[in-house]
Amino acid sequence: MKDLPGMPGTPGGLGLRVLQLLFAAISLAVMSSTADFASVSAFCYLITTTVLQCVWSLTVAIVDIYALLVKRCLRNRRAVTLFSIGDGITWLVSLSGACAAAGITVLIDADLIMCSENPCASFQTAVAMGFMCCFSLLPSFLLNFYSIASSHG
């Protein structure tokens, strides 16, 4: 396996995990703070995906911290494959949650013009943080996937 910055067990990898956790936690907190998120299934789905993202990122961040503290290499084929599959699934689920919530937010804001009755700024912030979470997860997935693909041949 190639030693790339951002791979599991590196400071760059830990930094990406912390960013993922931060963006997901902000999205979760902002959306949960709105009174009427439970009435819209797309907003509930965004909350579910951000909880999944928080759990995944926190777990992998703890593994990264442990690997950095004991100076253990996490770049073996089995571990990187596990991280790549987890990152890929989590990325797709998080992206679908952010897209679904974005669609409803645009509907409420631009099409129905109901922002006076709804906390549109909170919805938009939660959706933006959901997308930022996805964008910060993508490098982790791509680096792990590239590492697997390049070591196979």
UniProtKB/Swiss-Prot annotation:
Give me the disulphide-bonded residues: none
Spell out where the chain crosses the membrane.
11-31, 50-70, 88-108, 126-146
Enumerate the Cytoplasmic topological stretches: 1-10, 71-87, 147-153
Ranges of the Extracellular topological domain: 32-49, 109-125
Topology versus the membrane: Multi-pass membrane protein
Give the keywords, sorted: Cell membrane, Membrane, Transmembrane, Transmembrane helix
Pfam families, per database record: CASP_dom
Q: Does the keyword Cell membrane apply?
A: yes
GO CC annotations, alphabetized:
membrane; plasma membrane
**Where is this gene product found?**
Cell membrane
Give the residues annotated as coiled coil. Answer: none
Q: Which family does it belong to?
A: Belongs to the Casparian strip membrane proteins (CASP) family.
Q: How does it assemble?
A: Homodimer and heterodimers.
Q: What is this protein called?
A: CASP-like protein 16
Q: List the source organism.
A: Zea mays (Maize)
